[in-house]
Each structure stands twice: as C-alpha cells, then as structure tokens.
Amino acid sequence: MDDTAITKGLARTAVRSDEAATPGQVGMVTLVSGFKLSCALFGGDTRSAGRSSFERVQIGALIKVPTASTIAFGFVDSLALQNPGGNSAGQGVAVAEIELLGELVPPRPGMPPAFSRGISVYPVLGAPVFMASPDDLSRIYSKPNSPSLAIGSLYQDPSKTAYLISQEFLCKHSAILGTTGSGKSCALTVILRALLDAHPNGHIVCLDPHGEYGAAFPGIAEHITPQTLELPYWMLSFEEITEVLCSREPIARSREANILKDAIIGAKRDFMGDAGQSAFLTVDTPVPYRMPRVVQRISEAMGKLDKPDNALPFLRLLTTIDNLRQDQRYAFMFGGLVMRDNMAEILSRILRIPVKGKPITIIDISAVPSEIVNVVVSLLCRIIFDLALWSNRETAVPLLLVCDEAHRYIPNDESTGFEPTRRSISRIAKEGRKYGVSICLVTQRPSEISESIISQCSTVFAMRMTNEKDQNLVRRTLPESAAGLLNTLPTLRQQEAIAVGEGVPHPMRIRFADLDGKYRPHGDATNFPRAWETDQNGLEYLGEIIERWRWQSH
C-alpha cells in the first residue's frame, strides 16, 4: 500500500480487532509510552494454523506505524502471548513491544520522503501496524550522501547493503565488541580493507596481540614482528623505563628509580654534548643516550657510597640492565651496536609517513615478553599522540589506531594493568579527536574495560554476547538506545552485529561481508581431532623447539 495513502487514510482510524484488517496489516497499536509501543498482532485462533502475523513479526523486525503526518518506524523488542488459553473459542492475544527508531517525514516538493531519527508525531491508539517493506528499508538504509563504504548486508533483507560512513567512523572513536568466536577479527578486517580500498593513502596502526592480521593485508601492510621491531630504550618515558628496569617492591623501586633518573639525565647530556638545548633536557625528553654510559654513571655513584650496605639498589639495576642486554627477546629495545638518533626513521616506518603503498602497519606483539608488553603498547600509543600533538594542524597526518584485546591495556579495575598504558590510551580517547587521532577498540570482555574510555566510542559494532555483565555494559555505553536490537545480542550468528552510532546511517542489524580465504585473519582455534589423528613428531621435533627456546630465535 502507498505510504501517503496509509498516512492520510488510516492514521486517524482506530482498528478494532473484530474489523477487517487493512491489506498487509499485522496488528494495531494498543499502548503508547515514550519511545515504546505495544501492538496487538492479528493471527486468528492461536490454536489453529492462522498465524501469518505471528510468523512474520520476529524479534528485531522493522515495523512501521502511520501517524497524522509521518510514518513511524521501530524494532520489535519482545513478543508475548497474553491469555494463551483464551476463551471457549480458544483465542488469545499476541502482543509485540516496539522500540521506536525514527520517522519518514512528508517530502518537500520534488523530493523523496526523508527519514530522520527521533519521533515528532506519535502514533495514536488503534493505529495500524505494518511490516516494513523492501522499499522502506531502501529509504531508511540508503547509501548516505557523505562518503560511505559497503561492509555487509541488512539482516531484514540480505539484498540491501549495509553502509559505513567513513568520515564519521574515522574522525571519532569506535569499538567492536563480542564474545570469542563471534567474528570480531574478520569484522575488523572487512572494515579496514573497505577503508583502505577507498583511501589508499590512509594511516592505520594495528596492535596485533595474537599475530593473526599479518596475512589479512598482503601487499599493502608494513608487517612488523618482534624480530623486525625497533623501539630503542631511549624512546621510553621515565615511567616506562622504570617499569622495565626497576624492582616491583615499592621501597626498592623508589630507591632504584632515583638512581636511574640521575644516570639517565647525565647520559642524555653526555650524548647531546655542547648542544645549546642540553640544559633544558628532562628525564622524559626523547633524545638518545647510551646505556653503557648509564651503567658507568651508576657504577661511579655506587663507588662514592660511604657504606657498602647501601650498594644493593645499584647492584640490582646493573644486574637487570646486563640481563636485558643479553636477552635476545629484548633485542628490539636493547640491541643495536651503533647508537644514533633515528627517531624520524622509526616513526616513519610505524606511522607510514610517507605511505609508499603500505597504508597500514601491523605490529605483531604476540612474542614480545609479557613482562614488557604493556610498556611497548604504552610507548606506541604515547608516540602516536605526541606526534599529533606537536604537529601543525594544517599539515597533521590523521591516523587510526586499532587496539585489539583492549581489556588487557585499559582494564576497568584501576589497580590492575600498567597506569602509563591506560593514560596513553585515555588521552587518545579524550583528546585525540582534536589532533586527528582516533582509536578502534576490539575486545571480547567489554565489562572488564574502562567504562570511561569505551563510552567515548561514537560507533559500536556489538556482536554475539552471552555474558549478562557485557550486555549491560553495552546498553549503558552505546551512543543511542536500540533495545529492540540489543535484546538479540545472545542469539546473533557469527559475522552478525548490531551497529549503532554516528558511523552508520541508523541502528541496524547487519551481517558482515564474507572475506576471501586469502584475507582471513589467522585466528582459528587449533584442530585437536585432526592433529591427534597421527603420531608424527618425535625427539627431533622437541630438539628443534628446545634449540629455539634456548637461543631465543625463530
């Protein structure tokens, strides 16, 4: 039925259950309360086969209700059968709760009907309820006028494309949330590949904690592994180098930190020589210094002690530094035979300035020692923000930082995690937009992530979640309510998501596009049954592993 005819002819007429329903009508409004409607569904005798409306109206379905001057749309939030035993005729009443989404407003002359979020005219009691048609879906979820990218299809009609508004997604923060196995890695890959296909000169840095994204961007990614990573120790802030070198016990840590601070400042001044700015150096100034000079200064300070008993913190520092310099796992930080100021080269490689055909950097931190992985993440996030902070606004390079397993670095419990890492990510979340830095958080434990940070995300893709705490967190922090969709979170299939926020035209349930096998992240679980079919590994297999283990090389 034509939308105009529905609006003019039916909105003012209450439809009683004993009257003939308008063709296509599935029910009528029985309650209006804020952004919620109750609708009595048509279906005849609940003990008979006449259940067409019952079968068509499903949780998450999009319906429409004509009003006096608009057509309101909403998602089915819940379904119930009231008085199922019914009367002697065996009839009951099926009721649908509907969460309103927006409305189709009358078109201006020569213009098609325009959909807008929010409701200006509410449906009246008795107003007819219809299922949204394919044309309705096309109007509501049509390709936006601003630059947008296809990332999948609509749940209600797989032939309709789901779009991502690239500017709104990139200029603000985002999150991909879902339990393990829901398809987060593939969803992220679909989004990033769509962005890079449209913007081949982009700048994306992806922190890869499991080593799974390297194969997803062949030919267009700078893939950095622990064997090829270069983050020299002199780029660390004092908090970060203290975390690496000093003891965990608070009193000992404080003593060692004071010793280390004096040694580092002196070593930096030694490296700068007579440079005019050396007098303004601080312990956090990112200039090179030689670790042997730090060791020398610590040794000299220890030699001036009056009591040998006070030498313990000095000895601990010297022992730790020596151990780390010998440990091949830390070679990316403490290796290198020649000390030089190559900060610009390091930033160029990580941030893709210039792009040189590789607009994304995949930093595989899966083999970074667990003792310092938080320090590495803190350093990377900090240098990304600081570079943007000190750039000229007119020439600044916008950058997207993707942080997988975000709950590791910004836990909700402030007593856990590494405070500088939390602070670095928090600065990006709270201030990054002003400087052209946005962040995409990916996690399977949204309830364990800092709520103040995740609440900064303006676009959210919520995938399957079965944990009630996670679901409640999503409901509290999403930029807009879509309860009719969010109630489906526990039942979403793999690759499906509830997409809400400013990066999508309207709240929607989508299925992400299928990835070609060669672009799929390598995050699949080990196939135990297949591996256990044969007994092919022996002592030689163990010997090879032990060799790599001992000499810390792959």
Model-predicted segments: where are they?
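Basic- and hydrophobic-enriched, low-structure N-terminal and domain-boundary segments
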Residues: 1-177, 394-397, 413
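Glycine-rich phosphate-binding loop of nucleotide-binding enzymes
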Residues: 146-231, 451, 499, 529-532, ...
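Conserved beta-strand position immediately N-terminal to the Walker
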Residues: 174, 363, 440
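Loop/turn-to-beta-strand initiation segments
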Residues: 201-204, 357-360, 396-400, 435-440
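Hydrophobic residues in beta-strands of the RecA-like P-loop NTPase core, especially within AAA+ ATPase
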Residues: 207, 403, 442-443
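P-loop NTPase motor domains
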Residues: 211-222, 233-238, 243-424
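Conserved ATP-driven motor cores of ASCE-family P-loop NTPases powering translocation/secretion/packaging/pilus
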Residues: 247, 426-431, 435-513
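Conserved P-loop NTPase motor module
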Residues: 494-554
